[in-house]
Amino acid sequence: QPQKLSFSPNPHNKIGLYFGWRWIFLGWSVDVDDIYRKTNRKNKGTEFDLSLYSSKLGVDIFYRRTGNNYKIHKIRGFYDEIPSNYSENFNGLKVDIKGLNLYYIFNNRKFSYPAAFSQSTNQRRNAGTFIAGFSISKHNLDFDYEELPEYIQEKMNPGMKVNKIKYTNANISFGYAYNWV
């Protein structure tokens, strides 16, 4: 029987600075809960964002790092007696994500991407446009399976006992956007 562990981050509060001027936007945020609890530096979550918006192009560059504050929500294939609503804190997972999003606006003479998303320009009439996009992100997960409860480790398949998972996600998108003024 295949085994499955599902994790989700615990809710947390962030505080940060976000500065925008004309076509450039820079943001930084940090988990407030980690500052308040004075946890060690390894556990802190951080986020950086840099966005550039012009009439034809939009670019987002981002970096996100999570702390070790997760919950195990679903367990399958280990024990039949584990209830379906099982939930337990887990501090053995850390995630780093780096990414880039690119957008091209076809009707850039009438449609304003910055007016819709960054409020840095005005658009005087209703207008729509087709938008093409490209996105790529690199994900690095550090997984310490020895932080799992003992009864899960005992039944864990050897193939699930990994320390690092790395993958890259890339996609191309095409859509339509419309601004009502």
What are these regions (language model features)?
Residues 1, 19, 28-32, 52, ...:
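Transmembrane beta-barrel strands of outer-membrane/channel proteins
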Residues 1-14, 25-41:
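Surface-exposed strand-loop-strand hairpins of Gram-negative outer-membrane beta-barrel proteins
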Residues 6-10, 72-76, 84-97, 141-151, ...:
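Extracellular/periplasm-exposed beta-strand and loop segments of Gram-negative cell-envelope proteins
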Residues 9-15, 42-46, 94-98, 126-128, ...:
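Residues that define the transmembrane beta-barrel architecture of outer-membrane proteins
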Residues 15-21, 48-52, 100-106, 132-136, ...:
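Residues on the lipid-exposed face of transmembrane beta-strands in outer-membrane beta-barrel proteins
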Residues 26-28, 48, 57-61, 100, ...:
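Transmembrane beta-strands of outer-membrane beta-barrel proteins
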Residues 67-120:
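Hydrophobic alpha-helical segments and helix pairs
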Residues 107-128, 142-143, 181:
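Short loop/turn motifs that connect adjacent beta-strands in outer-membrane beta-barrel proteins
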